[in-house]
């Protein structure tokens, strides 16, 4: 509407200006007209609104001259009206549906025009899109030419190889019969030369083998590609607080079009990346570190020290009122290793067992560092459930000691889990004199010690029945030990078996090493001084085995950061977090069943967490979460690539809706060559894009948002523009760490990389001769 008004005013003002200049010329620029507005090439020009002042003052004296200027005045108005008429859009038909493709104004309303955010598509002007299509067609033509030429080259190469082997056989036969030494040496040289050629056959090269027929296409493609790589492109970015979902089959370009462009600087806040195969780390970690972010790689299977370590047990605030809730949440996630919507009897009781073991081991580490020297990890919890070594106690409750090589040591017993509980049910978790709890201080950026004694324990659990008679024993641990021991042996055995199954993966020594302590914590992602880029890396071979620990991470992340939405000042909420965090969950379904996490999608956006889910197809989601899942419903923006399955195509077709089209039908009447034809027009409905058309999208994608028309636009390919290519730098050799803790493997790897860089620098060093004097 605004641009139409501007067009009309431009025509009207132009007419008024021409009338003003014509009137001034007819009056020979008399002084009565006043001073001109400006001069151009010694010619006076008057502002168009001066005409109306002259009309008021002079029309009564020279009406005839004014009449001669009406042609321009009314002509401008007429042209403006005609322009409005011809620019009027044809009314859109809506009787059977009003679906239509979105345009630039719709993109602006969808908040996809942003300087930063998640890259969702490419929206170039018509000329650049035309050039890109030419490049893609030229690439197909080049590939076809190269393929045929390579096939012909391979056939010729096979013939050459056959002739070469035949010649080699003849040389060997000749060598066996020739007696002359010189001739034999010459034949031997020929044989060696031929063997080298046969051992290293030539490969097809378009410039060498098809210079006239194929190489022009290769050269033209490279030249046009270089030209387009220098051009600036318009990328659509989503920087809202709403979630996104991508449905794109494997090898469809979602990595090069969405993930990598987003990580190469488009998203400037914190990000957590589910990085299968470590591709995203290798391509984008270097640039994100250059952005000033903390770049962390958590790879549970890493054996070289390049990965940061994370111990979920260190997330529990020991000696504080929230310790039970944190331990219960952690244990529930661990027990629910299959991602069920609700745990059954055995799973719920297994969570209880894991809870009490976690709390006991942490307190025991502080209370009895001699027998529990290291802070517990998931490996220690799993091992504790298997069997234990505990001090041997005599009838009076005192440790039994013996002399070994002249040294007095305590005797120990190897016991099963239930036997261990019986001997530990009266364990003093907060002995006389208290304990010193080690915790991380963000202000000091170091570990500090906090004293905790029996009075602090009583303050946290004032209503516990056992606290009066057993002031040094943790009441919750004691009560749960008694509850477990009171269960029938068969039931207790099944519960412990369920707990062992849930924790079996953590007995892997490599996984145990990488979860033994924490180089970072989940709070750092949103509250560290600088934004953090965290890559959760796992090789495809270990995907199913390690899915539970990544599910654990994401669910703990949500539970930790979704406790309080913020504090209110002057009636407005002020966020508690320092940085927003993007959950970039590539191959979301590979993480297994995350029903509890999926249920949080409806509210976690308000806590600064934005989820970017990427799946291969709708059947993949339905197989895990059921057909009535609400995952896609909670994602405001949905991006559809050409799918491989029918369900995704039908889903997108129904989501986009129908348009109304006008069809013309022809009816013939009469006969004997005198027939007449009647034409009738009617309206009918048609899908704006059908399922089979969606499967043929090719280099295009669909962007669908609730409340807005769908956008049909081009895919991004980061390697086709220098804007992204210039950001490709080497990834760090080792992960950054926030909490400095001893890690010999990491330190050794750093020294090794430094030594390798020195050797490379020495090789590249250029020595110059500088004459003396």
Model-derived features: positions:
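Transmembrane alpha-helices and immediately adjacent membrane-cytoplasm interface residues
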Residues: 56-92
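Conserved ATP-driven motor cores of ASCE-family P-loop NTPases powering translocation/secretion/packaging/pilus
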Residues: 601-603, 607-702, 765
């Amino acid at each position: 509407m605004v641009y139409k008004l501007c067009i009309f005013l431009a025509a009207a003002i132009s007419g008024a200006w021409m009338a003003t200049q014509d009137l001034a010329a007819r009056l020979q620029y008399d002084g009565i007209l006043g001073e001109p507005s400006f001069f151009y090439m010694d010619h006076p020009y008057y502002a168009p609104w001066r005409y109306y002042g002259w009309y008021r003052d002079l029309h009564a004296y020279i009406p005839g001259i004014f009449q001669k200027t009406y042609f321009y005045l009314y002509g401008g108005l007429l042209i403006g009206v005609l322009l409005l008429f011809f620019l009027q859009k044809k009314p859109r038909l809506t009787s059977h549906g009003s679906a239509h493709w979105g345009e630039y104004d719709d993109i602006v309303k969808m908040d996809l025009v942003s300087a930063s955010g998640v890259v969702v598509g490419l929206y170039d002007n018509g000329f650049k899109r035309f050039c890109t299509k030419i490049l893609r067609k030229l690439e197909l033509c080049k590939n076809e030419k190269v393929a045929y030429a390579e096939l012909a080259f391979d056939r010729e190469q096979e013939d050459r190889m056959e002739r070469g082997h035949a010649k080699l056989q003849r040389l060997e036969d000749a060598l066996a019969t020739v007696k002359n030494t010189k001739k034999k040496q010459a034949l031997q040289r020929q044989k060696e030369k031929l063997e080298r050629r046969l051992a290293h056959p030539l490969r097809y090269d378009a410039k060498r083998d098809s210079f006239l027929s194929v190489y022009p296409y290769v050269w033209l493609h490279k030249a046009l590609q270089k030209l387009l790589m220098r051009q600036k492109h318009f990328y659509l970015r989503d920087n809202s607080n709403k979630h996104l979902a991508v449905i794109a089959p494997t090898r469809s370009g979602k990595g090069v079009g969405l993930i990598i462009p987003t990580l190469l600087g488009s998203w400037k806040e914190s990000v957590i990346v589910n990085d299968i195969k470590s591709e995203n780390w290798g391509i984008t970690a270097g640039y994100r570190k250059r952005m000033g972010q903390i770049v962390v790689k958590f790879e549970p299977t890493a054996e070289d020290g390049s990965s940061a370590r994370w111990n979920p047990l260190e997330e529990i605030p020991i000696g504080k009122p929230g310790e039970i809730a944190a331990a219960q949440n952690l244990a529930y996630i661990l027990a629910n290793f299959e991602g069920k919507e609700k745990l059954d009897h055995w799973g719920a009781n297994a969570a209880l067992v894991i809870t009490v073991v976690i709390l006991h081991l942490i307190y025991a580490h502080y209370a009895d560092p001699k027998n529990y020297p290291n802070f517990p990890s998931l490996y220690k919890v799993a091992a504790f459930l298997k069997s234990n070594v505990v001090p041997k106690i005599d009838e009076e409750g005192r440790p039994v000691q013996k002399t070994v090589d002249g040294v007095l040591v305590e005797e120990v017993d190897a016991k099963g889990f239930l036997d261990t509980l019986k001997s530990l049910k009266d364990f003093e978790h907060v002995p006389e004199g208290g304990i010193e709890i080690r915790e991380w201080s963000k202000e000091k950026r170091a570990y500090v010690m906090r004293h905790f004694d029996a009075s602090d324990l009583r303050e946290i659990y004032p209503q516990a029945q056992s606290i009066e008679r057993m002031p040094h024993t943790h009441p919750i641990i004691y009560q749960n030990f008694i509850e477990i021991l009171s269960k029938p042996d068969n039931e207790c055995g099944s519960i412990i078996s369920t707990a062992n199954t849930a924790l079996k993966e953590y007995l892997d020594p490599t996984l145990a090493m990488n979860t033994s302590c924490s180089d970072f914590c989940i709070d750092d992602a949103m509250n560290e001084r600088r934004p953090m880029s965290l890559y959760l890396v796992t090789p495809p071979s270990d995907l199913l085995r390690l899915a539970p620990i990544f599910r654990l991470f994401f669910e703990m992340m949500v539970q930790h950061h979704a406790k309080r939405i913020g504090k209110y000042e002057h009636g407005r909420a002020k966020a508690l977090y320092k940085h927003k965090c993007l959950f970039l969950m590539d191959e979301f379904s590979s993480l297994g069943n995350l029903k509890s996490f999926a249920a949080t999608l409806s509210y976690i956006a308000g806590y600064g967490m934005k989820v970017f889910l990427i799946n291969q197809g709708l059947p993949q989601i339905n197989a895990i979460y059921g057909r009535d899942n609400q995952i896609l419903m909670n994602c405001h923006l949905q991006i559809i690539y050409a799918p491989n399955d029918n369900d995704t195509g039908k889903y997108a077709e129904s989501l986009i809706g129908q348009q109304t089209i006008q069809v013309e039908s022809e009816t013939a009447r009469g006969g004997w060559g005198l027939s007449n034809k009647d034409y009738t027009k009617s309206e009918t409905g048609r899908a704006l894009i059908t399922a089979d058309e969606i499967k043929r999208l090719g280099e295009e994608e669909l962007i669908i948002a609730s409340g807005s028309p769908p956008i049909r636009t081009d895919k991004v390919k980061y390697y086709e523009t220098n804007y992204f290519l210039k950001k490709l730098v080497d990834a760090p050799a080792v992960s950054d760490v926030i909490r400095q803790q001893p890690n010999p493997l990491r330190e050794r790897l750093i020294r090794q990389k430094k030594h390798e860089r020195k050797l490379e620098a020495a090789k590249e060093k250029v020595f110059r001769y500088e004459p003396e004097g």
